Amino acid sequence: MKKNREAQLCLFSALLAFLPFASLLNGNSKYMVLVPSQLYTETPEKICLHLYHLNETVTVTASLISQRGTRKLFDELVVDKDLFHCLSFTIPRLPSSEEEESLDINIEGAKHKFSERRVVLVKNKESVVFVQTDKPVYKPGQSVKFRVVSMDKNLHPLNELFPLAYIEDPKMNRIMQWQDIKTENGLKQLSFSLSAEPIQGPYKIVILKQSGVKEEHSFTVMEFVLPRFGVDVKVPNAISVYDEIINVTACAIYTYGKPVPGHVKISLCHGNPSFSSETKSACKEEDSELDNNGCSTQEVNITEFQLKENYLKMHQAFHVNATVTEEGTGSEFSGSGRIEVERTRNKFLFLKADSHFRHGIPFFVKIRLVDIKGDPIPNEQVFIKAQEAGYTNATTTDQHGLAKFSIDTSSISGYSLNIKVYHKEESSCIHSSCTAERHAEEHHTAYAVYSLSKSYIYLDTEAGVLPCNQIHTVQAHFILKGQVLGVLPQIVFHYLVMAQGSILQTGNHTHQVEPGVSQVQGNFALEIPVEFSMVPVAKMLIYTILPDGEVIADSVTFQVEKCLRNKVHLSFSPSQSLPASQTHMRVTASPQSLCGLRAVDQSVLLLKPEAELSPSLIYDLPGMQDSNFIPSSYHPFEDEYDCLMYQPRDTEELTYSVPYGREKDVYRYVRDMGLTAFTNLKIKHPTYCYEMNMVVLSAPAVESELSPRGGEFEMMPLGVNKSPLPKEPPRKDPPPKDPVIETIRNYFPETWIWDLVTVNSSGVTEVEMTVPDTITEWKAGALCLSNDTGLGLSSVATLQAFQPFFVELTMPYSVIRGEAFMLKATVMNYLPTSLPMAVQLEASPDFTAVPVGNDQDSYCLGANGRHTSSWLVTPKSLGNVNFSVSVEAQQSPELCGSQVATVPETGRKDTVVKVLIVEPEGIKKEHTFSSLLCASDAELSETLSLLLPPTVVKDSARAHFSVMGDILSSAIKNTQNLIQMPYGCGEQNMVLFAPNIYVLKYLNETQQLTEKIKSKALGYLRAGYQRELNYKHKDGSYSAFGDHNGQGQGNTWLTAFVLKSFAQARAFIFIDESHITDAFTWLSKQQKDSGCFRSSGSLFNNAMKGGVDDEITLSAYITMALLESSLPDTDPVVSKALGCLEASWETIEQGRNGSFVYTKTLMAYAFALAGNQEKRNEILKSLDKEAIREDNSIHWERPQKPTKSEGYLYTPQASSAEVEMSAYVVLARLTAQPAPSPEDLALSMGTIKWLTKQQNSHGGFSSTQDTVVALDALSKYGAATFSKSQKTPLVTIQSSGSFSQKFQVDNSNRLLLQQVSLPDIPGNYTVSVSGEGCVYAQTTLRYNMPLEKQQPAFALKVQTVPLTCNNPKGQNSFQISLEISYTGSRPASNMVIADVKMLSGFIPLKPTVKKLERLEHVSRTEVTTNNVLLYLDQVTNQTLSFSFIIQQDIPVKNLQPAIVKVYDYYETDEVAFAEYSSPCSSDKQNV
């Protein structure tokens, strides 16, 4: 029953369509309303009304219907009999980003009514947003600078508020965010510093709009060395299988434009290089030297690849790789190319061939014959066949390889037109696997346009890409048939132009009709202004209405030049400058434009090419893309094609049937324009109902209507500005000669310019800038935004920073006193003439230098030549020694080469300064003497004796005295250098993080926080936050060395530490809340029913094992961390944890108190945080009995602490655990509720005095945890006792001799670290304090000691392989082997660091060091400038063996031994030293 009703409706609909004058209105009244199928809010939109043969006044109403109600768009009274008119309307913003709504069109008169409803998509107007970074790739520790650009679809700037912007690392951690950022005049610049050890890989900048839409931009973080030159491989785009030779050219050019001397290896492989080894073996290699232009061209014979004998090989490309090795340095860089393989020697390109044909209108074809390189082939005969039209023709290509054809379509009876063009004879091949020779041949199929009356119109355009602001002419060809034409005096053709989904232009053309004719044929021209609003694609629809209601139409798509209204130009004058010279940058744009400038070293773009910011890129942004909306099939009033249940008997009505999906009727023309039609006119081609049921998904896809006539065959590069750059202004006469201009180069940025400037009212801004010292080419561009003309982009401007000649120094990073090394100065002359040169090493009392060989101070350097001068240098002073080498071109009447040299006017002298570190021999020692001195009315003094051991290394002793007015002055100055130890694991990284929280809190509470200190501390917090995320596991936990690809186990203690630190840092920086939640969730899963926490992961600090057992000590620490994270004691996890501690305290009370000191200090602080004063007091009372009181100070020690070695000249610094315990007691006392009592403060002061004596010279302590906890205690004590006194203490230090220095401390310089060097070592000094107030005095003594035999806590053996010299010229590379075991008092050590210092002039072979991380006990390796660090999770009495290779970088004479140090990270007194020498160090070396 249902099927019968559907069939009746289908038949009724189809009959209506074929009744000549049938409509819902009487007579001949016709209606067509065209509206974009996709409408935008807050944007003027148009609806076009076409009312035809009205016989009464009507009202036209348009309304949008949604779930929220009905919104009337307009209500128009129409009195004209014929009307073509477009009305504007605006839709208010939607609550959601888009929604499908119903558009109702009602046309109502006194007698008749027409009403129709269709679905349209309404979308909120979205801004166009993109992000520009200052460069595409960053090194760890660098600053990421970026700007957010916001515009409307017309590219005018917007002041847009973005609720959120953030940066995601490769693990999708949100590492930085900004809230409520607003662009001003369309621009907002932000920056963010990467940590020193970020996760490497792709990062994302995400900008969140208020609509919820996200815009993203990617950049890369990786370690890299900028390439000094690029390699360009030039190969043909394609070859034919009949070619026997391929010419491959490889050129290597320095970034400053000069050729590279060296060697090139060219590899040519056929097939996919990622396939099997069989495919990979199909390669040829050619080696050659680069010529004077830095190039090498090779003719590679490819006959052995047998391309034409094997069908499969005919379709595989060649891959070319060229690796250039620079002469002298051995630096290698590569370039690549790809060569396609074609079956024919030439091919056809269809430049014009429409996808559809129209009966009676000629079908135009334009082709181009090109060779395998793409070059046109003139004067060649080409053939064309169109069998359905009975058309065969031949012609000769013109000088451009073009041929044109016009095919008469009148005789075509079917629905398709198959065109074949070919060159020479037709191919004899039938199967695709045929290997016989083929000639160019192409096919094109066009399908019929449907018209019931066989009437058509065709828009013909020859254009490729239309230039903006010009008139484009379109030819219209038409043929109209039908008896009803005779009653019309004229035919009116209407057209409209659309772009970006909106109707932009409308117009019409009238053609007079002679009375009584049954066919009208002709053509006319339409002139279309090409406006900016039409970029990048415009579509034009033309149609006319025949008297019987049939609509005849055609459309065409134009590619429009991607132009911008704001014309921007950036230039440098001069375009080539010396490093460090001044250059003039000029930017022109629309007046009052805000311009973002950028200039990047070309080396960066060689390393990581990026898409150039161009009009093409702008118009390809998501916000600029336009798409047609086709309603979903479930909408009941979106009718399908009309269908007939039977074939009409009138064969004149339907003489053919085009397959469904390929016919082109008016409905599809309208739909493909992006329009929805409301009409009672005939615009659809009916189809038999059974045909529609036979439609299958495998039918060929409908061809896109978005391409120009000829579809894919008329492709041209878009957005490329081919206009020449403006000529530089004429050069002025050279100025009078100045004294020799000397260049000293030391500034080498990767991004030179990153600024915002405003163009003045004349449209110009000019800036004087200093060129960096890098010898390279700078790539610069400007992005400008104007309220009047919108966005403008400059083309890339280049500035070549170049020097006619320059000098480069080769020297080691450091040497040990007594060693000698070769200092080499290489001078490169890039002038086309020879120059007399003078090279000079500036004399210094810090070293002696002897020229090597026959080198002269002056010599003649040939054109494009290089020369190296050498000196054998022996440093005489310790510390940093400067080496300054100058090279100068000198005027001389004598011949240089074969001519008298001409000295350049600029750049006649180049100077390079490098620093060498000269270290004393032996082992470094440091002692710090700290005191908290509080004076009242009477003067307070103490004596200080600086003693040196008898074996001290000569001249290595140095000392300084520091005075601070604040308890945290030293730590504030050195927050990133608190301890002189590596920071390579997750726990150690936190010493770079947590102290900044305490410093900020303390300074904020005491009102001493300055913007400078705040900025520095926040930067350190952000960097530490990034680094710590490297050590996060997927389950939310953290461990010392991270996930290790899912194999590592989270560490309970470290996770708690990170949790509390991140929670406290939230007050100062952005911390992604998910990291805190994840850590807490993971910790809660580790809690047992008893409330205690089970241990996960290794405890790398054995002090945690010193209490009752691991579980209680660990539980106390975690409870403390949870409470410091602002969790209330009522939280279920915290409440259970406190229950665990209470039960554990009862056990401890019954035991032997002395063995639980560490655990009790943690518990005291945990109960204090929970507000349980009773338990806090009980534990503190117990601890008071175990306190060690000496010299008016109080501290605690572990009974089982390691024994100190005998023979110390000074009392050694307390170990990490003792500092921790004492600091926890202070924290417990200061956390008393509601406030610490005078007794708490007094007792705390005694411990604070002891703690300050343990501080090192940087304000930290012996290790990481003690530094974090002690600084927390110091900051809380400082805040509790802080007062701004009106009286100022005066500190005096004087020696037993004549030395004396005074320091005044007041409120203005409390945080200032005042320091003076002490002249007499050894010597006796007196420190006195007068006035009133407390000061912190610290003396630091450093010296070196020769390596002595001792009884260390580690057995350490170091040797080289080979042991002895087996090369009379010296050992350039050898292996270092280490054997380590623990011999201390405990079963095993804590985490251990093995620090291997490099011999002077040697560097480690990094892959051999990295390979050690595969060993079981090696958690991490680091290669620093002069050291190799091995992180060992622990060491027992079992010997561990490691080895790696080092190689000579710079020859050094009289090589001194290098030191290897192995130490416990948390018990730094447990240390062992050894030394090693080069196998050839005892022999004379040729350096």
Curated annotation (Swiss-Prot):
Compartments, as annotated in UniProt: Secreted
Tissue: Plasma.
Role noted for this protein: A proteinase activates the inhibitor by specific proteolysis in the bait region, which, by an unknown mechanism leads to reaction at the cysteinyl-glutamyl internal thiol ester site and to a conformational change, whereby the proteinase is trapped and/or covalently bound to the inhibitor.
Disulfide feature: 48-86, 251-283, 269-295, 468-563, 595-784, 643-689, 860-896, 934-1334, 1092-1140, 1365-1480
GO biological processes: acute-phase response; embryo implantation
Cross-link (Isoglutamyl cysteine thioester (Cys-Gln)): 985-988
Annotated glycosylation sites: 55, 247, 301, 321, 393, 508, 760, 787, 882, 1004, 1153, 1324, 1437
One Gene Ontology term of the molecular function aspect: serine-type endopeptidase inhibitor activity
UniProt GO cellular component terms: extracellular space
Stated name of the protein: Murinoglobulin-1
One Pfam family matching this protein: MG2
Induction of its expression: Expression level in the liver as well as protein level in plasma down-regulated by up to 70% during acute inflammation or tumor development.
Signal peptide feature range: 1-24
Species: Rattus norvegicus
Chief localisation class: secreted
Keyword field: Acute phase, Bait region, Disulfide bond, Glycoprotein, Protease inhibitor, Secreted, Serine protease inhibitor, Signal, Thioester bond
Bait region: annotated span: 686-745
UniProt family annotation: Belongs to the protease inhibitor I39 (alpha-2-macroglobulin) family.
